[in-house]
């Protein structure tokens, strides 16, 4: 059977960042089973698109998800990033 994911890698990285704004690229990669290079590229894509802002915090980066922005999908354009993230973050917080 073909392996697939409900969320794209970009969506999964966005959830990781929303859960922990100080998360390291190494930790994103390890938790999602991707390379650090892929994590770096995806975070760069999200930053270029304006969905994530990168801020230096000493030697590390902190990320700010722009939750007010609409989803890029046309079928869900009336929803914001924050509304969708709340669903995934609430599910993650449950024991």
Residue ranges of model-derived segments:
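Alpha-helical residues within the helix-turn-helix
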Residues: 30, 47-48
């Amino acid at each position: 059977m073909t392996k697939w994911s409900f969320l794209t890698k970009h969506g999964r990285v966005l959830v990781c960042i929303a859960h922990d704004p100080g998360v390291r690229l190494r930790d994103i990669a390890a938790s999602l089973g991707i390379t650090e290079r892929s994590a770096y590229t995806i975070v760069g894509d999200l930053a270029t698109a304006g969905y994530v802002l990168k801020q230096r915090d000493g030697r590390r980066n902190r990320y700010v998800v722009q939750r007010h922005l609409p989803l890029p999908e046309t079928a869900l354009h009336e929803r914001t990033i924050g509304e969708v993230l709340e669903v995934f973050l609430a599910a993650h917080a449950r024991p």
